[in-house]
């Protein structure tokens, strides 16, 4: 059977049909969380700390890290997200020993996350958009990481399952 292995420095999570259910904690994400976004812009990572510890205590096998916040002081995520991703990953790795899932729509933040993460993280939210694939697939090969793929391309998410399958095969 096919299986996917995700690792931290000390722990391994195996995803596959003949393995137990794997829980991915998704709370470390400022998208739609105005209070967390404001805290991160102010340099306050206390909610990230609490969310990381609470999710592991609740049984998370993997923690998703998303630094997707647009700062009021600098609205360019290409500049703000990579260093924020690095800080968040370093913080979470210092608090927990579970593997990580790197989640971003900013290519530079993905690369920073992959460089910073210890072990073999999971790469989340990989779409079939041509421009994105051109950047992401070399990173996947360079860091030998598994991905969570989303079956949408430059035209969006199709309602036709055959089109979705074609996008997934990319």
For the regions a protein language model found, what residue spans apply to each?
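Domain-level signal for soluble alpha/beta catalytic cores
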Residues: 1-170
